[in-house]
């Protein structure tokens, strides 16, 4: 190795050899100093022993730490079947819209569920309108399948929907719902999409034990929904970043 260094730069090699001839001590560089591995970070867990949780409004507008019960959703439902993919929820051509820009977010809402097959006679958002009259979406199996697209839950929330109740979800769509905090992805214990019709009046009640109940006032039937678990408080806070700020995991903006 020394021979190759001397061959490449003999002058530099002689200079280094002379200066280090009588010393083999290396001078530590201040840039190589590492922080102690014993540092302990006091992060707060995602779960809470409290029966009440922070609502999205409280999380976004107040730092007082006030906790109130999760709101109840009431309105008309829009019924879909199995395998509703993200291209049907929001076609890829609208992927250039930026949700953080108010005008773009409004446009995303107007295009929500614009890619549905033609056999769905009703439109989720009437052409020319920016909001939907349906506040609850009821789906079948594998809702939100296809490509990973944060615009999918964002457009539903921007259109005015509060919750999706489906038999099951594609994992990536469920996680995007939690991460963005745009809409509640609730899971039914039975196949509700076969028993409800678009336009039925429904209510989703959230109980203190974490479970939820869907009441169809049109058919006078009730359906128990599965608990959201640790994902619930994150959605209530308005998404993963809002929750992390509220919990003290990251600095407030």
Curated annotation (Swiss-Prot):
Recorded GO MF terms: 2-(omega-methylthio)alkylmalate dehydratase activity; 3-isopropylmalate dehydratase activity
InterPro entries, sorted: Aconitase/3IPM_dehydase_swvl, AconitaseA/IPMdHydase_ssu_swvl, LeuD
GO cellular component terms attached to this protein's record: chloroplast; chloroplast stroma; plastid
SS bond partners: none
Effect of deleting the gene: No visible phenotype under normal growth conditions.
Localization of this protein: Plastid, Chloroplast stroma; Plastid
Enzyme Commission code(s) on record: 4.2.1.33, 4.2.1.170
Main location: plastid
Cited SUPFAM superfamilies: LeuD/IlvD-like
Catalyzed reactions: (2R,3S)-3-isopropylmalate = (2S)-2-isopropylmalate; a 2-(omega-methylsulfanyl)alkylmalate = a 2-(omega-methylsulfanyl)alkylmaleate + H2O; 2-(3-methylsulfanyl)propylmalate = 2-(2-methylsulfanyl)propylmaleate + H2O; a 3-(omega-methylsulfanyl)alkylmalate = a 2-(omega-methylsulfanyl)alkylmaleate + H2O
Residue range covered by the transit peptide: 1-56
Tissues in which the protein is found: Expressed in vascular bundles of roots, cotyledons and rosette leaves. Expressed in stem vascular bundles which branche off into lateral inflorescences. Expressed in connective tissues in anthers. In hypocotyls, expressed in parenchyma cells surrounding the vasculature. In rosette leaves, expressed in phloem cells and cells close to the xylem along the vascular bundles. In roots of adult plants, expressed in cells closely associated with the stele. In flowering stalks, expressed in parenchyma cells associated with the phloem or the xylem.
Keywords linked to the UniProt accession: Amino-acid biosynthesis, Branched-chain amino acid biosynthesis, Chloroplast, Leucine biosynthesis, Lyase, Plastid, Transit peptide
Gene Ontology terms: biological process: glucosinolate biosynthetic process; L-leucine biosynthetic process
Function: Catalyzes the isomerization between 2-isopropylmalate and 3-isopropylmalate, via the formation of 2-isopropylmaleate. Functions redundantly with LEUD1 in the methionine chain elongation pathway of aliphatic glucosinolate formation.
Subunit structure: Heterodimer of the large LEUC/IIL1 subunit and the small LEUD (SSU1, SSU2 or SSU3) subunits.
Family named by the database record: Belongs to the LeuD family.
Listed name of the protein: 3-isopropylmalate dehydratase small subunit 3
């Amino acid at each position: 190795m020394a021979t190759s260094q001397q061959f490449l730069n003999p002058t530099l090699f002689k200079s280094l050899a002379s200066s280090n001839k009588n010393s083999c001590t290396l001078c530590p560089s201040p840039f190589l100093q590492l922080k102690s591995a014993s540092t302990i970070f006091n992060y707060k867990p995602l779960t809470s022993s409290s029966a009440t949780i922070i609502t999205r409004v409280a999380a976004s507008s107040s730092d007082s730490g006030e906790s109130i019960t999760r709101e109840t959703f009431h309105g008309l439902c829009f019924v879909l079947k199995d395998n509703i993919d993200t291209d049907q929820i929001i076609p890829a051509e609208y992927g250039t819209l930026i949700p953080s820009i108010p005008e773009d977010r409004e446009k995303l809402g107007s295009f929500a569920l614009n890619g549905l097959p033609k056999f769905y006679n009703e439109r989720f958002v009437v052409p020319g309108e920016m909001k939907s009259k349906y506040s609850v979406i009821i789906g079948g199996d594998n809702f939100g399948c296809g490509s990973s697209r944060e615009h999918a839950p964002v457009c539903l929330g921007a259109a005015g929907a509060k919750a999706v109740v489906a038999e099951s979800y594609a994992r990536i769509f469920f996680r995007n719902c939690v991460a963005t905090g745009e809409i509640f992805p609730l899971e039914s214990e039975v196949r509700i999409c076969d028993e409800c019709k678009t336009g039925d009046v429904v209510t989703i009640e959230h109980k203190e034990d974490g479970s939820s109940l869907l009441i169809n006032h049109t058919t006078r039937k009730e359906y128990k929904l599965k608990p959201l678990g640790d994902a619930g408080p994150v959605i209530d806070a308005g998404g993963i970043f809002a929750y992390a700020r509220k919990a003290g995991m990251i600095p407030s903006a």
